[in-house]
Each structure stands twice: as structure tokens, then as C-alpha cells.
Amino acid sequence: MKLPSPWDNFLDGLLTLPMVLPPTVAGFFLLLLFSKRRAFGSFLFTHFGIKVVQSFLGCVVAATVISLPLMYRNARSAFSLVPKDLVYTGRTLGMSEFSIFWKIIVPLSAPGIFSGTVLSFARALGEYGATSMLAGNIPGKTATISQRIALVMQDQDYATAGFWVMIVLLLSFGILTLYQFATEEKQFRR
């Protein structure tokens, strides 16, 4: 699947940009976007009661924006590997573009989409910079595991830091195992 050429490079760059920006820079832009003092943030809060800055939702938004490029790149690569003749066959059989996408392209791309999802989750798990900028570090409300580790290390509480580090190591190992399974499954199918 290819976007019209004037827009594909722009959209690709926009969706990949958070991968190359320092997380604090991405967090700064997210803070500007979602602040109640700015148009979009004010609109969300006034009309829907949605507060992103210094909230759990801010943690989710920051982690999603920072990790999205990994998902996007994997999905895009998986979509490009779908044999074009299968898409043409679907068109010949009268399938709509929507049906072709959901019944041919997505199922054949599933391993790549899954591995992108796993990598995105792993990246989101370790997110610190953008989350700190957008959601803050409010204990019990917006503090992530990475922020918690940094906080207890400032207090030289090595036992608590060690506990959280072990949690992250176990989660990361599990995520990498899932990723490995997905990539091996994809190679096995070819």
C-alpha cells in the first residue's frame, strides 16, 4: 500500500519523528499541545473534561507518542511484504479496498504488526523523558517505574531500586521473548 507521493514522505517523517527526537523535546511539544492554556488542551478540558497534563492519561499519551514509531515502522514493513498479486486478485474478485485490507493485508502482516506492538510496549515501559515533561512525577498518580527508580536512587534506597529494576528486567525479558517468538514465526511462514 502506498500513499500518494506528495504526502508519503511528510506523513512518514511525522510518524517517525518521535523516534529521533530527544524524549524531553517530544514531551515539551506534547506539553504545549495539551496544556489547558493552549487551544487544543483548553478545548479538550472545556468540552470533554479531559485533562492530559499531570494525569495518568498524560503518561499514556507520552508513552504512546514516543513508542508509536516502532509500531508504525514494523507495520509498514509488514504491509510492504504482502504479495501484490494477492491484492490484485482480491480486486479482480470484486473485493472492496476495505475488505482487501482487513481480509488479506492485515492477516498476512499480523506477525509484523505483533512484533511492532511488542517493541512499542517495551519502549513505552522504559519511557521517562516525555512522561516527566507531560505527566510529571506525582507519586501514586503519574509516576512510572522508570521515574520511581530514579526517585528512590536519589534517596539512595538501593533495595527498593533493586526491586523495581528486577521487575523491569523480568518484564523486558518477557517482552523480548514474545518478540523473538513473533519474528521466528514470521520467518517460519516464509
What are these regions (language model features)?
Residues 7, 69, 76-92, 158, ...:
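C-terminal transmembrane helix and the adjacent membrane-cytosol boundary/short C-terminal tail
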Residues 9-12, 16, 42-46, 77, ...:
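Short amphipathic alpha-helical coupling elements at transmembrane boundaries
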Residues 12, 16, 20, 27, ...:
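Small-residue faces within membrane-embedded alpha-helices
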Residues 72-75, 79, 83, 97-130:
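Transmembrane alpha-helices
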Residues 1-15, 28-32, 78-80, 86, ...:
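Transmembrane-helix boundary motif in ABC transporter permease subunits
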Residues 27-64, 135-138:
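Membrane-interfacial helix termini and adjacent extracytoplasmic/periplasmic loops
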Residues 3-11, 39-40, 55, 85, ...:
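Membrane-helix interface segments
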Residues 133-173, 177:
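Interhelical loop and adjacent transmembrane-helix boundary motif
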